[in-house]
Amino acid sequence: MTERRHTTPAIDVAVTDPRDPVARHCLRAYFAELAARFAGGFDPGRSISADDDELVPPAGLLLVATRHGEPAGCGALKLHADGRAEIKRMWVAPGARGLGLGRRLLTALETEAAARGATVLRLETNRALGEAIRLYRSAGYREVAAFNDEPYAHHWFEKPVEPTDREGNDPWTPPTSPSASRT
């Protein structure tokens, strides 16, 4: 399987092993920001897991964004056998905010989830993350009843997605062969 890269000038978004040093940097920065922004702090040990083994194929994946070679953001997927996928660990470095990177990461996660057969994406977030809540709403996520017992969550969202094949095509549309277009 060829991994998709979501690249534009100066910013590269790629599937990355969560044990990679750049991935570790992003995840540490994500946890530190949550600890600073949440009223009662943040302890990753109390949160619903997204362990390294859950963030590598086929269980899931971690996307890491770099800007000019430096860590700029991350986002993860946890895949479930019933067609659900969870978005986890969405973070954009302070110096990369305002560039649309959060939306790019979210769109890339949606693309990756659809390519892996997901039919619905879910996520939860904390009320202190107003910019994330606005992003999710503007991207078509709708607020739903709590679907887990995440102690740090105040908002739960979901969005249906159409599964695609690994190349980004609708799996329900048969491919056209080159000979079919000849007359």
Q: What feature does the model see in each segment?
A:
Residues 2-8:
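Short, conserved catalytic or adaptor-binding loops enriched in Gly and charged residues
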Residues 9-84, 88, 93-94, 106-107, ...:
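Acetyl-CoA-dependent GNAT
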Residues 18-19, 26, 119-122, 126-140, ...:
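C-terminal "cap" of GNAT-fold acetyltransferases
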Residues 69, 100, 117:
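Conserved G/P- and acidic residue-centered "switch" motifs that form tight phosphate/ATP-binding loops
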Residues 93-95, 99, 127:
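Active-site acidic-Proline motif in GNAT/NAT acetyltransferases
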Residues 99, 103, 107:
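Residues forming the Rossmann-fold NAD(P)(H) cofactor-binding site
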Residues 106, 112-125:
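Conserved GNAT acetyl-CoA-binding A-motif
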